[in-house]
Swiss-Prot record:
Superkingdom assignment: Eukaryota
InterPro entries: Calcipressin, Nucleotide-bd_a/b_plait_sf, RBD_domain_sf, RCAN1_RRM
Recorded GO MF terms: calcium-dependent protein serine/threonine phosphatase regulator activity; nucleic acid binding; protein phosphatase 2B binding; protein phosphatase inhibitor activity
SUPFAM superfamilies: RNA-binding domain, RBD
Biological processes annotated in GO: calcineurin-NFAT signaling cascade; calcium-mediated signaling; locomotion involved in locomotory behavior; negative regulation of calcineurin-NFAT signaling cascade; negative regulation of smooth muscle cell differentiation; response to estrogen; response to ischemia; response to mechanical stimulus
The protein's name: Calcipressin-1
A cellular component term, taken from the record's GO annotations: nucleus
UniProt biased composition (Acidic residues): 163-175
Modified residues (Phosphoserine): S108, S112, S163
Signal peptide boundaries: none
Tagged with keyword Phosphoprotein: yes
Gene (name only): Rcan1
Function: Inhibits calcineurin-dependent transcriptional responses by binding to the catalytic domain of calcineurin A. Could play a role during central nervous system development.
Amino acid sequence: MHFRDFNYNFSSLIACVANGDVFSESETRAKFESLFRTYDKDITFQYFKSFKRVRINFSNPLSAADARLQLHKTEFLGKEMKLYFAQTLHIGSSHLAPPNPDKQFLISPPASPPVGWKQVEDATPVINYDLLYAISKLGPGEKYELHAATDTTPSVVVHVCESDQEEEEEEEEEMERMKRPKPKIIQTRRPEYTPIHLS
């Protein structure tokens, strides 16, 4: 066949099975396995019911490629079955690699600094002196044009409000009320109780 010229790295297929009977009924499982045993006799199956997937492990990559070419997108018990090559992940070590040291160290030095670690100086705060100067020049009752009008945009004008006399008076009255002592609440005397049977 034409595909035997290629060098395949994968010897496992992942089958996406829509029919859930493959995972529970032994007869359906035997039918499913017989489809692939024609391509390789030393084949093993791993069933993942919750994912609706079956991993099929072949003894060589050519058998896996042949099975995929013949059975991909074919019907199995009335539903389409899709086959994909399983991706193998090669990790150099059996241990997890430590995370990259990016952004692990703050400005203060860590307890055991790594090789090449240097102290970073704090940046000076950015102060906009032009803005502070403009704010200091603002006075109450005046208007300031921030942006002149053009043919397509309106002008932006700031009106600085004067403090309202009425508001100040209300605030003073409120302060006086708070300073006054609270009036004493005299409790009313409870009326005399005379039982009905005695009257």
